[in-house]
From Swiss-Prot:
Possesses sialyltransferase-like activity in vitro. Transfers sialic acid to the oligosaccharide Gal-beta-1,3-GalNAc and to glycoproteins such as asialofetuin, alpha-1-acid glycoprotein (NeuAc-alpha-2,3-Gal-beta-1,3-GalNAc-) and andasialo-alpha-1-acid glycoprotein. The transferred sialic acid is linked to galactose of Gal-beta-1,3-GalNAc through alpha-2,6-linkage. Keywords: Glycoprotein, Glycosyltransferase, Golgi apparatus, Membrane, Signal-anchor, Transferase, Transmembrane, Transmembrane helix. This is Sialyltransferase-like protein 1. Glycans are attached at N49, N212, N258. InterPro entries: Glyco_trans_29, GT29-like_sf. It is a single-pass type II membrane protein. The gene is STLP1. One of its GO terms (cellular component) is Golgi membrane. Its EC number is 2.4.99.-. The chain crosses the membrane at residues 9-27.
Length: 393
């Protein structure tokens, strides 16, 4: 009985082994290698450029900004303002009337003789009264917020300058300035522009000692407003400040600072023309979009998925250079750029920049501005001859 069973079992085992041996080749024939996809053809340069220009012109911050302006004009602090959120949590109920004869407004619990602290004023959403002149300024600022590259041509008159400036030095804050000994060269220019209240005391040999115009963004002024003994003019009452607005609520800081100046002859804080803001924003966004496409190979439309598009912004330094292009016959730029062995900022221990800027994109713009300004988008519609721009490293 056992012998008849052994033979069929051996035959069955042989069939199974043969099938197992042939399975990989059968699988390869049935599945086959994955087809090799041909790479996508590169996008036509003219078509890509048109896409970048179109996307750079889109402004996702316009709708929330419009709401913030409306809130202020209706006597409410914008809900998007971090300040408004803090005040709602604190529950302060101090009135603020933005009228010159009522400033400065001091923090609750502080006597005017104790601290010169004019900007720290809690503003409840329910009790905000704007001076009529501030209301007009706010309306005008928002109404002018449109694309008009011709604003560069009109900058000398907009800034109340008697004419163009023969030579300008724009001084950034990079640590590469330390040890560069550019101080005397910087001060030899007819005008020196500085950024975000950077210290010059103790650094004059490398960064110069002269300041004719200070550029800041409104976040810097607002942060100053949170500290005791905040003075609006760190370079002295006679040095004008040009400030671009990051949030509509920061108009309150500007109005407060201007109204509480320690001297009747103090230079005022001027808000940049919003048409210049729009021009700067479009140029930097274009270069950021172009960098994104070149480095990732992805569609330009996907750029916004990697950044907070509504908060994306150019730097104070970029706008300072743009103003210099508009008002100066010759522009020298110092303290822009990074080095592995250099501090981030020459005057502080800050380690990195904010994500809302794209500095690599701005550096690409600077290279084009210095070497081939005719290719810079939007700038070529400004109707001006771009002056010589030299970057010192």
């Amino acid at each position: 009985m056992k012998r008849p069973l052994r033979r069929p079992f051996a035959v069955l085992l042989f069939v199974v082994l043969c099938a197992a041996a042939s399975f990989p080749s059968v699988l390869r024939r049935s599945v086959g290698p994955a087809p090799v996809l041909a790479p996508l053809p590169p996008l036509d340069p003219a078509r890509l450029n048109a896409t970048l220009l179109r996307l750079a012109a889109a402004d996702p911050s316009e709708a929330p900004l419009r709401r913030d302006v409306d809130d202020l004009l209706e006597g409410r602090l914008p809900a998007s303002s971090a300040r408004a959120r803090a005040w709602r949590l604190r529950g302060d109920r101090l009135h603020l009337h933005l009228r010159h004869h009522q400033f400065p407004v001091y923090r609750r619990g502080h006597h005017p003789d104790h601290d010169h602290d004019p900007l720290l004023h809690p503003l409840p959403r329910q009790e905000l009264l704007l001076d009529p002149s501030l209301r007009r300024a706010l309306r005008s600022w928002h109404r002018l917020r449109r694309h008009d590259p011709g604003v560069l041509r009109n900058l000398p008159s907009l800034l109340s300058l008697p004419g163009r400036i023969p030579s300008c030095a724009v001084v950034g804050n990079s640590g590469i300035l330390l040890g560069a000994s550019h101080g005397a060269l910087i001060d030899s220019h007819a005008a020196v522009f500085r950024l975000n209240n950077a210290r010059i005391s103790g650094f004059a040999a490398n960064v110069g000692a002269k300041t004719n115009l200070s550029f800041i963004n409104s976040n810097v002024l607002h942060l100053c407003a949170r500290r005791p003994n905040c003075f609006c003019h760190p370079y002295g009452d006679g040095v004008p400040i040009l400030l671009y607005i990051c949030q509509a609520a920061h108009f309150l800081d500007v109005a407060s600072c201007n109204a509480s100046s320690r001297s009747l002859h103090a230079a005022s804080i001027s808000v940049t023309d919003p048409r210049l803001d729009v021009l700067c924003a479009r140029i930097v966004k274009y270069y950021s979009l172009r960098r994104f496409v070149a480095e990732t190979g992805r569609a330009a439309e996907e750029w916004s998925s990697t950044r907070d598009a509504a908060m994306f912004h150019y730097s104070s330094g970029m706008q300072a250079i743009m103003v210099a292009v508009g008002v100066c016959d010759r522009v020298s730029v110092f303290g822009f750029g990074k080095a592995a062995d250099a501090k981030h900022h020459y005057h502080s221990n800050q380690k990195a920049e904010l994500d809302l800027h794209d500095y690599k994109a701005e550096y690409a713009f600077y290279r084009d501005l210095a070497d081939r300004p005719e290719v810079v988008p939007f700038l070529n519609d400004a109707g001006i001859a771009v002056p010589p721009v030299v970057f010192y490293h």
